[in-house]
A protein has these predicted regions:
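Active-site catalytic loop in hydrolytic enzyme cores
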Residues: 78-84, 131-163, 328-417
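CN hydrolase (nitrilase-like) catalytic-core segments centered on the catalytic cysteine
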Residues: 93-96, 122, 269, 276-277, ...
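A conserved mid-to-late transmembrane alpha helix and its immediate loop/hinge
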Residues: 160-165, 315-316, 412, 460, ...
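Short, conserved active-site loops that position catalytic residues or coordinate cofactors/metal ions
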Residues: 24-41, 70-73, 233-234, 266-283, ...
């Protein structure tokens, strides 16, 4: 086998990171994802075949170059909101990704099965992506399947698999191409039949999903069930305005003259962005809220049958005998309260309905592992509004008072496919995404977040109305097409009709079944590998003692 020098491996690690970065939305070319992991696979194979010449954790060290470059190039924009948060997210996420590669090398070394060795890494990787969704350091922005977010014609089959199907697709093609390239590097003779088999496999794996997806995209017809929606984009600067303007000034921006000219009695829903109402509202005292009162008066005057959905910072007092959770904050010597990032559902007459954001941003909306580090919660990064560990909703709330059942997904929650599908399983026929992306300024961050909503539309076959404080606000149909959008960092109001849907997709019904399956297989692989490792260590020790 041709042995590459260590400097060549470093170059390969850099190449893999560059290819992953250049594939990423919004300006990237996603086809590059199909070759982006080949350099990394070559590195892993080189280390595996020449393990005696490499230091411990060599797989981790080389792959860390790849993932640090990729994470930095695609999520650098976090720096605009928090320097510490950016460094933490980039460094730790790169370490976790590299750890996956290192664990795969450990398993390969113990299992000593060539065929199994090749497929261990994608199995572990998909398991990592799946498990990374549901812990305190969750950061799923760079799930590989997200790479196709701006090219939804290729991935209409996400309605069956979700983004983990895209991750699997990328890994399979990379591995098949790696077989060919590795045979060249290894100077192995491949029979014509074997080479043709690999080429056919690559063609089948790439072409069949692509053709089916394009056909599905071209032939998908939405059942007519139009819902009239207005999106408000007040463009409040989160650094200088949103948390400093008076309630009256915020309401004047939100319910602008343009909004008043566009909204009439035919509008079904009016949607405002995340955290736009920062009045310090206690949830048992909404009747005293100036913001809620003004919205109700606005509805009565302009559109009495409409329903108003808006983000807000709200609070709830704990009852005297109520157990205190990790989000509890001291109000005074005897009373406790908790804060929420809330979606308010308001009509012209009844009390507002609330949904509390449940996928919280680590370090901003919750301190990771708060049960262990409650004393240092005051270090939570302050981005305005409510900070520290926030309270959550245990249920995926569906609002039934309007013409169709709807749900509001708050900001970061829209990145989680299975999470969003739970609202649909609970009855939502439309999804509203309310967000405030102004923290990241005019970078790739808000654009990536915008196109990720297109993936949720395909997965659930739900039309999406997205209200973003500074943009991009938009309407997305059930195929994932953006049918109308605003410009970034402008004050605007747009109105359109999108179709509600009652059908449940395979993905909505079964969720991330690929990730669950891979996690079970990974657990088995790691367990067997540990047993083999310990058995070998015992035998080695016995052999040494016998001598």
């Amino acid at each position: 086998m041709l042995e590459l020098k260590k400097k060549h491996l470093i170059l390969l690690a850099i190449l893999s990171g560059l290819l992953l970065s250049l594939a990423w939305p919004l300006r990237g070319f996603p086809f590059l994802a199909f070759i982006s992991l080949i350099p990394l696979l070559i590195i892993v194979e080189q280390i595996q075949q020449n393990s005696s010449k490499f230091l411990l954790f060599a797989s981790f060290r080389y792959s860390y170059i790849t993932f640090l470059l990729w994470n930095t190039a695609t999520t650098y924009w976090i720096w605009n909101s928090t320097e510490f948060g950016a460094l933490f997210a980039i460094i730790v996420n790169s370490m976790l990704m590299s750890l996956v590669v290192q664990v795969s090398s450990f398993i390969r070394q113990n299992m000593k099965n060539q065929i199994l060795g090749i497929i261990i890494l994608p199995i572990l990787w998909i398991s990592f992506e799946f498990l990374h969704q549901d812990w305190d350091l969750s950061w799923t922005w760079l799930t590989l399947g997200n790479v196709f977010a701006s090219h939804i014609q290729w991935i209409q089959w996400y309605e069956f698999t979700g983004v983990h199907g895209g991750t699997l697709w990328i890994w399979i093609i990379n591995i098949l191409l790696f077989f060919i390239i590795n045979s060249i590097i290894s100077k192995k003779e491949i029979c014509k039949a074997g080479r043709n088999s690999v080429i056919i496999a690559i063609s089948v794996v790439f072409i069949i999903p692509s053709i089916w997806s394009i056909w599905r995209y071209k032939t998908y017809d939405e059942k007519p069930n139009p819902v009239d929606i207005v999106l408000l984009q007040p463009n409040l600067n989160p650094y200088t305005e949103e948390y400093k303007l008076s309630v009256d000034e915020v309401m004047e921006r939100l319910l602008s003259s343009k909004a008043r000219s566009i909204i009439d009695t035919n509008v079904d829903f009016i949607v405002a962005p995340e955290s736009v109402l920062q009045e310090g509202m206690f949830e048992d005292e909404f009747c005293y809220s100036i913001s809620v009162r003004e919205i109700k008066e606005f509805l009565k005057e302009y559109s009495p049958k409409s329903h108003f959905i808006s983000g807000a910072g709200t609070f709830r007092m704990f009852k005297p005998d109520e157990p205190l959770g990790p989000s509890a904050r001291r109000y005074n010597s005897t009373m406790w309260y908790e804060a929420f990032n809330t979606a308010l559902f308001i009509d012209s007459s009844g009390a507002p309905v609330t949904y509390h954001k449940s996928k919280l941003v680590a370090g901003v909306e919750q301190m990771p592992f708060v049960h262990l580090i409650k004393p240092i919660e005051k270090l939570a990064i302050d981005l305005g509004g409510t900070v520290g560990t926030l309270g959550k909703s245990n249920d995926r709330t569906v609002y039934y008072k309007g013409v169709v059942p709807v749900s509001a997904v708050i900001c970061y929650e829209s990145v989680y496919g299975e999470f969003v599908s739970e609202f649909v399983k609970n009855g939502a026929q439309l999804i509203f995404v309310i967000t405030n992306d102004g923290w990241w300024k005019n970078t790739a961050g808000h654009k990536q977040h915008f196109v990720y909503s297109r993936l949720r539309a395909v997965e659930t076959r739900r039309s999406i109305a997205r209200a973003a404080n500074t943009g991009i606000s938009c309407f997305i149909n059930q195929r994932g097409d953006v049918i109308q959008s605003t410009e970034y960092w402008t004050q605007d109001v747009i109105r359109n009709k999108i179709n509600a849907n009652t059908e449940i997709t395979f993905y909505t019904k079964h969720g991330d079944f690929i990730g669950r399956g891979m996690s079970v297989v990974s657990l088995l692989l790691i367990s067997v590998s540990m047993v083999v490792y310990l058995f070998n260590r015992i035998n080695h020790r016995k052999t040494r003692l016998s001598k």
